Amino acid sequence: MHPFLTALIFLTTLPVRPRANAQPAPLSRAAPWFPLVGLLLGGLLTGAAAALGALFPPLLAAVLLTAVWAALTGGLHLDGLADCCDGLLAPVSAQRRLEIMKDPRMGSFAGIGLILFLLLKVFALLSLPPGAGGWAALLLAPTLARWLVLWLALQPQARPAGLGAALAEGLQKPALLAAFLPVGLAAALGGWRGAAALLLGAAAAWLILRAAKARLGGVTGDVMGLCIEMVELVTLLTFAARIPPL
């Protein structure tokens, strides 16, 4: 199976039908295709936003677009965000935090975190500028997030046999640089806000890495999910902010 199809199956719920007996590519080979999958998601979200905006009032359209966003990814990254809320915020040891994050039950921190996050996402979508600025935000958010998660995969892992280790195995920095192409394209469409989103998204990923190292001893798959969700939100907020151009 082509690595792009493996990435598409791993990151989305899109109905991909590989050939019979086709074996998925190793995750490390699929990883450089993550940003391109993000760009595809951004294109689908842009189309969904246009359709929903034409059919419904703005607030309802923003809520429905948030639901479409979650449906396209199967809630995979929201699950990581919820687990990180429970684990990273618990006043316990690093080992106990890792155990909490593997527990399928959702704690109070996860519930509160998910509610606040989804409210922020809905109102960030509602506040996006009309036209090209809003489309650029929807294209860049999932693309940048899935590029920065590759950088996280190259950092120390809290679980040697976890998702991060599978992603990092064989992943080289030249592949990481090549994977930036769709990110650069999407950022260019956003003008100065696109450039600002690159910087702020990278800062968010760095802060998440620092917290993961301090509280868990390294990165996990849940931390990567948290990174994707937070970078997407930061990107949307950057485009929604009422800041005059420089």
For the regions a language model picked out, list residue spans one by one:
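Hydrophobic alpha-helical transmembrane segments
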Residues: M1-G74, A90, Q95-L98, D103-L246
